[in-house]
């Protein structure tokens, strides 16, 4: 039995408040200054269409507005959240449809604002030919209630007996209600075996996952009897809210567990037991945004598989084939992940390596060669620079083998080992088509790297079976080597074919891939910081919005 039709939505993002100012705007009014307003548009991931999200207030007679009305956006690290800020001069009728009222616009991603120094960026306004349109200043602030963590403990009494030869094996499932009336699963307790009076272990959950910041939003809790075959028996349910749960900080709260079917069929039905909230507390913890705002940089490194199993790059059947019409799976994976991570790296310089190729002129086999052919400086300028070096390498090296991961993992680990203050966190993207040839050495490298500020993303391309890669992704069983277990789960593996859009929409394919492979990075960074007791540094001092010269009346 599936658990009560929970939807497949992501856990709610943290909420980011954007403050907007402008400087040196165009002056369109004849007898006074412009009356500016900013309109924010967000871009749909699926259709790429721009939709209006909100507007600031209008500030009269100024070219240097500091707007009071803010924009509050859900923030997902793993998504490219494109924003467009349009600035208008608004007349008394609030009419902004005329082209002459347009003062300029700026395009950028939400990640660029958060990744800016002190989560603050300044961008030039463009869009009016032949005119300097001034600048827009954007500041991102995480809403305070997004960092709250609720810890609670529950027990039950006299639950219905569901097992024929014994008592029930009860567990709880928590659901957050959505605005459209559906429910999203947000937590499952452990199973307590063979009892009708279970006491569950205390657990913690982000408040935003429980209610998305709405303290009165319905929280539904289902009670199930666990069955080995997965067809868990429904015992009953009850509803509450974050606000009601929080009252347990001062008193026990008892809920009746009701089974709607039994209630309809049996006149004398009272309930299927009770659940008691024994304790409830709320604490704040540091978030991913805290570390980014404090200056932590994400250092992105790429490693690409140049083994012969990819096929001749000159042939359309090759996974490396450079079609003039569309990107290869390798290029799509690189672009999808890199274009998001680059917003959190101030210098935009990315080391990029290949492995499994014979290098000219002597034909030496290398498992860690710089794509830009520069052993002293393997950095490429931006993701476009990485792609350019990758395409150039395909023209000069000979695809060969075998497939070794350990050398490039150890290379990045050596750099990460030099950082212990939380100022940098390394993300290695490995893109490969086949079976790994150095599994023992790779496991050893991963176990060693698990104690460092480092995460590894592996994307499998092509039709191969990737069972060995699943073994490296420690979601279910922690990776081990020589009896030593990885300190943290730092590997995320996905097969690219699972994300290819059937209609051939490459933008959508890349967005889906990035969403899955990057979703774990914030928590992996936080787990490293917590185990090392590293607190985020205070945001660097940022000069206040530049004060313009006094405007002449």
Curated annotation (Swiss-Prot):
Keywords: Calcium, Differentiation, Metal-binding, Repeat. Transmembrane segments: none annotated. Residues 536-553 have a biased composition (Pro residues). Ca(2+) 2 binds at residues 163, 225, 227, 233. Ca(2+) 1 binds at residues 163, 169, 225, 227. Residues 299-500 form the VWFA domain. Probable calcium-dependent phospholipid-binding protein that may play a role in calcium-mediated intracellular processes. Plays a role in dendrite formation by melanocytes. PANTHER family: COPINE, COPINE-9. This is Copine-9.
């Amino acid at each position: 039995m599936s658990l009560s039709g929970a939807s497949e939505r992501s856990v709610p993002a943290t909420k980011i408040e954007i403050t907007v100012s402008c400087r040196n705007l165009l002056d369109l009014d004849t007898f006074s200054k412009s009356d500016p307003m900013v309109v924010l548009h967000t871009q749909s991931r699926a259709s790429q269409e721009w939709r209006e999200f909100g507007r600031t207030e209008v500030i009269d007679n100024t070219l240097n507005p500091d707007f009071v009305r803010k924009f509050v956006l859900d923030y997902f690290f793993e998504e490219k959240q494109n924003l467009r800020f349009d600035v208008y001069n608004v007349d008394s009728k609030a009419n902004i449809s005329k082209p002459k009222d347009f003062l300029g616009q700026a395009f950028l991603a939400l990640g660029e604002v958060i990744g800016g120094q002190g989560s603050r960026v300044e961008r030039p306004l463009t869009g009016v030919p032949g005119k300097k349109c001034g600048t827009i200043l954007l500041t991102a602030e995480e809403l305070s209630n997004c960092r709250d963590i609720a810890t609670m403990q529950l027990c039950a009494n006299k639950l219905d007996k569901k097992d024929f030869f014994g008592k029930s094996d009860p567990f709880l499932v928590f659901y957050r209600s959505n605005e459209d009336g559906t429910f999203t699963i947000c937590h499952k307790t452990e199973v307590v075996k063979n009892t009708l009076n279970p006491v569950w272990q205390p657990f913690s959950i982000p408040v935003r996952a429980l209610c998305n910041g709405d303290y009165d939003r319905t929280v539904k809790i289902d009670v199930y009897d666990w069955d080995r075959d997965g067809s868990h028996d429904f015992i009953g349910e009850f509803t509450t809210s974050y606000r009601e749960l929080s009252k347990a900080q001062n008193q026990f709260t008892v809920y009746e567990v009701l089974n709607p079917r039994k209630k309809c069929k049996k006149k004398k039905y009272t309930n299927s037991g009770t659940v008691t909230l024994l304790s409830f507390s709320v604490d704040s913890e540091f978030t991913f945004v805290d570390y980014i705002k404090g200056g932590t940089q994400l250092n992105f490194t790429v490693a690409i598989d140049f083994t012969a199993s990819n096929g001749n790059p000159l042939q359309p059947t090759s996974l490396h084939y450079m079609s003039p019409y569309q990107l290869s799976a390798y290029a799509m994976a690189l672009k999808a992940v890199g274009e998001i991570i680059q917003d959190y790296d101030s210098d935009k310089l990315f080391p990029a390596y290949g492995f499994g190729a014979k290098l000219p002129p002597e034909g030496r086999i290398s498992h860690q060669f710089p794509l830009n052919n520069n052993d002293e400086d393997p950095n490429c300028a931006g993701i476009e620079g990485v792609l350019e070096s990758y395409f150039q390498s395909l023209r000069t090296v000979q695809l060969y083998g075998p497939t070794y991961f350990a050398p490039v993992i150890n290379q990045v680990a050596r750099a990460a080992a030099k950082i212990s203050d939380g100022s940098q966190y390394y993300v290695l993207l490995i893109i490969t088509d086949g079976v790994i040839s150095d599994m023992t050495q790779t496991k050893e490298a991963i176990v060693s790297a698990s104690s460092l500020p480092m995460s590894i993303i592996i994307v499998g391309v092509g039709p191969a079976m990737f069972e060995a890669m699943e073994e490296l992704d420690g979601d279910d069983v922690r990776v081990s080597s020589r009896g030593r277990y990885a300190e943290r789960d730092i590997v995320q593996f996905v097969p690219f074919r699972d994300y290819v859009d059937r209609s051939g929409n490459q933008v959508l394919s890349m967005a889906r891939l990035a969403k899955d492979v990057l979703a774990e990075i914030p928590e992996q960074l936080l787990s490293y910081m917590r185990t090392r007791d590293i607190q985020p540094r205070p945001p660097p001092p940022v000069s206040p919005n530049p004060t313009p010269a006094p405007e002449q009346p």
